[in-house]
Amino acid sequence: GATTANSGYPRSELREMTAGGSQNASWSNTAGSHSMTIRQAITHVPDVKPHVVAGQIHDGSDDVVMIRLEGTRLFVEGSSNDLGELDPNYALGTPFTVQVIAQDGHIYVNYNGVPKVTYARAGSGFYFKAGCYTQSNPSRGDAPGAYGEVIVYGLHVSHT
């Protein structure tokens, strides 16, 4: 799959845009409320390093929070730290809904309607990403044809 400038891992993601898709979105969680709700299922992971990211808040330089699957453990990661578990025994192909809310200098993550993570992290230049960011490649021991797959059934982004 395709990689981007700052990563050696392949991805197929939607990036939040504005102005009918002609401008990159960029907002601060210290003003207003910003929400992304995704109904999705992770359906495939690489064999050797079975890691996939299925949703993110990103800023101008790096990820802020990621919805991440490692093996069967679905959790939230932020600044390379484990922020909280969503499902310790996620089964591939199981649909779930994750809501990421950024407001008042915090990021909140709900999983299937249940609050799971509160993360104190204020910032700007934020934007949402949804899709599949596979966290492996041949240098990690996976075959060149290894892949991750995420099916997005529904996606809603709002700003108030």
Residue ranges and their predicted role:
Residues 72-75, 107-108:
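Hydrophobic residues embedded in beta-strands of well-ordered beta-sheets
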Residues 110-114:
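Short strand-turn-strand beta-turns centered on an Asx-Gly dipeptide
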